């Protein structure tokens, strides 16, 4: 499973769902304009 809000990802971007970014070790939602 992939992670969404506040999911711990460390430095691994693959821990976050598509459309989410690993930021400060947690998954954050990213809006592509």
From Swiss-Prot:
Signal peptide positions (record): none
Segments passing through the bilayer: none
GO CC list: extracellular region
Disulphide-bonded residues: 2-17, 9-22, 16-27
Lineage top rank: taxon: Eukaryota
Keywords, in A-Z order: Amidation, Calcium channel impairing toxin, Disulfide bond, Ion channel impairing toxin, Knottin, Neurotoxin, Potassium channel impairing toxin, Secreted, Toxin, Voltage-gated potassium channel impairing toxin
Residues modified to Tryptophan amide: 33
Tissue: Expressed by the venom gland.
One Gene Ontology MF term: ion channel inhibitor activity
Subcellular location field: Secreted
Keyword rRNA processing recorded: no
Free-text note regarding domains: The presence of a 'disulfide through disulfide knot' structurally defines this protein as a knottin.
Family membership: Belongs to the neurotoxin 10 (Hwtx-1) family. 21 (HpTx1) subfamily.
Function noted in UniProt: Blocks transient outward voltage-gated potassium channels in rat ventricular myocytes (thus prolonging action-potential duration) and rat Kv4.2/KCNA4 channels expressed in Xenopus oocytes. Is also a weak blocker of calcium channels in rat cerebellar granule cells.
Protein name: Kappa-sparatoxin-Hv1a
């Amino acid at each position: 499973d992939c992670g969404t809000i506040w999911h711990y990802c460390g430095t691994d971007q693959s821990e976050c769902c598509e459309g989410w970014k690993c930021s400060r070790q947690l998954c954050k939602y990213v809006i592509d304009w």
